[in-house]
Curated annotation (Swiss-Prot):
PANTHER family, A to Z: PROTEIN NRDI
Protein name stated in the entry: Protein NrdI
Gene expressing this chain: nrdI
GO BP field: protein modification process
UniProt cross-references to InterPro entries, sorted A to Z: Flavoprotein-like_sf, RNR_Ib_NrdI_bac, RNR_NrdI
Family assignment from sequence similarity: Belongs to the NrdI family.
Organism, scientific name: Salmonella paratyphi B (strain ATCC BAA-1250 / SPB7)
SUPFAM superfamilies: Flavoproteins
């Protein structure tokens, strides 16, 4: 299986989700001056910001990470978290990234996710990588 890369704000909701998921993952640093590069294909797990609108939905750290061509070339899919209070815009960072990077939006979960979300993502990630390897 290939990599998961995620960002979590100081609320740690996405981080707790990733810990419960139990799959190898790399965290995009909260400090915007710290940079990472990913050398293998990955699925990005990202929270949505901005109170429900598209403007500001993608965290700045994630924008900076994806503006690095090395990292952008390796993204294969996106999973988004959000808050259902934002209505139709909940998890919209995933929609924005999927469109801009030309990758599939794979899943959306609320806040820290439920056990069902954990199970669905674990299964979906495995199936996604298997499907990609068969089509390569």
């Amino acid at each position: 299986m290939s990599a998961l890369v995620y960002f979590s704000s100081s609320s740690e909701n996405t981080h707790r989700f990733m810990q419960r998921l139990g799959l190898p993952a790399t965290r995009i640093p909260l400090n915007e001056r710290e940079r990472i590069q990913v050398d293998e294909p990955y699925i990005l797990v990202v929270p949505s910001y901005g109170g429900g609108g598209m403007a500001g939905a993608v965290p700045r750290q994630v924008i900076r990470f994806l503006n690095d061509e090395h990292n952008r070339a390796r993204i294969r899919g996106v999973i988004a978290s959000g808050n259902r209070n934002f209505g139709d815009a909940w998890g919209c960072a995933g929609d924005v990234i999927a469109q801009k990077c030309g990758v599939p939006w794979l899943y959306r979960f609320e806040l820290m996710g439920t056990q069902r979300d954990i199970d669905n993502v674990r299964k979906g990630v495995n199936e996604f990588w298997q499907q990609l390897s068969r089509s390569a």
